[in-house]
């Protein structure tokens, strides 16, 4: 430690401890660093006595049973077909002519129409058959 450092007065430490105790009494939560450790268990709040008195005045509902969040199949739960969102997406077209037909039938708004790469694909997309070579 530095011998030239200013020493805290004992009165300052006491006032800090007093302020913390006052805060702990007003604040509804317990802080482990504000309470001294002791072997005696923590006492419940005074409000629990009042709430237990109120609880005794309430009528008992003995017929209540815990419910399941997911109902048992067949017991009150209607049988719905699985939603379409759970079905796997359709497989992509395997042939080039399928792709050409789909893009003509369902054109994309943002993208320009696809340009054919080969003359055979161009003839197929127009409805003509490709020229046969013998």
UniProtKB/Swiss-Prot annotation:
Keyword Cytoplasm: yes
Signal peptide region: none
UniProt feature, compositional bias: Basic residues: 1-17
Compartmental location: Cytoplasm
Region: Disordered, residue numbers: 1-21, 108-134
Alphabetic keyword roster: Cytoplasm
Lineage top rank: taxon: Eukaryota
GO cellular component, one term: cytoplasm
The keyword Cytoplasm appears for this protein: yes
Principal subcellular localisation of the protein: cytoplasm
Protein name: Uncharacterized protein C3orf22 homolog
